[in-house]
Amino acid sequence: MEGVLSSLLASSLIVGFPSLIFVCSILIYYYLCVMKKKISSKDSLPPVIGVYIMRCIYSITQYWEMIIPQIKLYRISNDYIVFQCLSVVFTLKVMDYLKDGPKTIRELSQLTKSSEKNLFRVMRALTQEHIFNYNQSNQTFSLNSCSKLLTSPPPPSSSPFEQNGILSTNDEELGCIFSMLSYPTFIDAWRSLKECIESGVSGFQAKHGMTFFQYIDEKDTYIKKIFDSAMRQSYATKIHTQIINGYDFSKYKKVCDIGGGIGFLGFEIVNHNANTCVCVLELEETVRNGLEQSKVDEKKQRIIEEQRLVFKTGNMFIPRSIPSANLYIMMQVIHDWNNNDAIKILSSVASTMRMERNHTGQSPKLLIIDSILDDNINNDTYKRSCIPDIIMMAIVGGEERTLSQWGHIIKESGLQVLTIKKFNRPPFLSLIELTIQ
């Protein structure tokens, strides 16, 4: 044990102190600048410095886990327990009850019809994880910046989406994503992960006997509403802003967003490009969801009335159902599918693009917005998409792909790469611009 502690101390001296000195220096400099009024106290630290600080902290934690591997195993086990605790209090709507202000555990247990003792133990554990705040003097729990992200929308209106608690008015909230991940149907799919690995089909299909998309279309339309709404909350990563700033949409008059959900990216494109119209191609149920949810936003409703954005029912596997356009977009669509289906989808789009070229004499472009895994499995950037890749495997039967894997399905579909642009901010997607061969 003494040897382990000595190694830990040595690693702290080697790895921790330089990082700690750097972080402290930045904070002292920031404080002095505030004192001298060179910058406002409300200004945040520059993003680069913030990212570096987080990397320093992460690297120190990672180094300790390498020295004492038991720490890693305990952390992984604890993470699962924390998720279960958080899932329960989320289901009990504890966050919603705390929106009006701090409450004692007795008040919370009465509101949630729960065991006061057991609820307190769970809340205490989540407080230690900095998900809630606890005031020792008056023994009340309250929301913090983390738990506020998991509150529901304002009181229900006539909209069925608000009545179901899945229409969030705050782009920063993550309630819909958490609802989806903690939904019993999803949990059952994770319990079938062993069957997924053994059989090669998704855990969802192993458990429910059909694919995820078949299930939400045929058996459980409520989870489809959650799924569609959860896609909105990718706004929390500001990915749509990255895309708008990272690609010139203004040179395209007609854009078709294939599998564009309820129009999140489409509305952003229209808002920033006055001469561009967008067609969102989706399945019938999603089109209904998109039109319904757009009704609560006056700006979106006006855009639809002006026909600058239209929803169209179609099937991306069938070329004739894909409308003509100058630019086709597929944002995080291909990763939902295995290679055979991905090639079928891309071939279908390529066929439509070829018909458009024969008709107009101009070749449309296809913009794929998706993750690209690093070919080197030991590269730190590989970690960014490994967990999403497991989600694809277990739930929808799709996968995240390396550049060489992307190259294979693109070539097999009769397409070729023009440009690739990688974003260096979460969720670390890439823009792959394609044309027909």
Swiss-Prot record:
<dbReference type="Pfam" id="PF00891">
    <property type="entry name" value="Methyltransf_2"/>
</dbReference>
<feature type="binding site">
    <location>
        <position position="259"/>
    </location>
    <ligand>
        <name>S-adenosyl-L-methionine</name>
    </ligand>
</feature>
<keyword id="KW-0489">Methyltransferase</keyword>
<dbReference type="InterPro" id="IPR001077">
    <property type="entry name" value="O_MeTrfase_dom"/>
</dbReference>
<dbReference type="InterPro" id="IPR036390">
    <property type="entry name" value="WH_DNA-bd_sf"/>
</dbReference>
<dbReference type="InterPro" id="IPR016461">
    <property type="entry name" value="COMT-like"/>
</dbReference>
<dbReference type="GO" id="GO:0008171">
    <property type="term" value="F:O-methyltransferase activity"/>
</dbReference>
<keyword id="KW-0949">S-adenosyl-L-methionine</keyword>
<dbReference type="InterPro" id="IPR036388">
    <property type="entry name" value="WH-like_DNA-bd_sf"/>
</dbReference>
<feature type="binding site">
    <location>
        <position position="316"/>
    </location>
    <ligand>
        <name>S-adenosyl-L-methionine</name>
    </ligand>
</feature>
<dbReference type="InterPro" id="IPR012967">
    <property type="entry name" value="Plant_O-MeTrfase_dimerisation"/>
</dbReference>
<dbReference type="GO" id="GO:0008757">
    <property type="term" value="F:S-adenosylmethionine-dependent methyltransferase activity"/>
</dbReference>
<protein>
    <recommendedName>
        <fullName>O-methyltransferase 10</fullName>
        <ecNumber>2.1.1.-</ecNumber>
    </recommendedName>
</protein>
<feature type="binding site">
    <location>
        <position position="282"/>
    </location>
    <ligand>
        <name>S-adenosyl-L-methionine</name>
    </ligand>
</feature>
<dbReference type="GO" id="GO:0046983">
    <property type="term" value="F:protein dimerization activity"/>
</dbReference>
<feature type="binding site">
    <location>
        <position position="315"/>
    </location>
    <ligand>
        <name>S-adenosyl-L-methionine</name>
    </ligand>
</feature>
<comment type="similarity">
    <text>Belongs to the class I-like SAM-binding methyltransferase superfamily. Cation-independent O-methyltransferase family. COMT subfamily.</text>
</comment>
<dbReference type="InterPro" id="IPR029063">
    <property type="entry name" value="SAM-dependent_MTases_sf"/>
</dbReference>
<dbReference type="Pfam" id="PF08100">
    <property type="entry name" value="Dimerisation"/>
</dbReference>
<feature type="active site" description="Proton acceptor">
    <location>
        <position position="335"/>
    </location>
</feature>
<dbReference type="GO" id="GO:0106268">
    <property type="term" value="F:3,5-dichloro-THPH methyl transferase activity"/>
</dbReference>
<dbReference type="GO" id="GO:0009058">
    <property type="term" value="P:biosynthetic process"/>
</dbReference>
<keyword id="KW-0808">Transferase</keyword>
<dbReference type="GO" id="GO:0032259">
    <property type="term" value="P:methylation"/>
</dbReference>
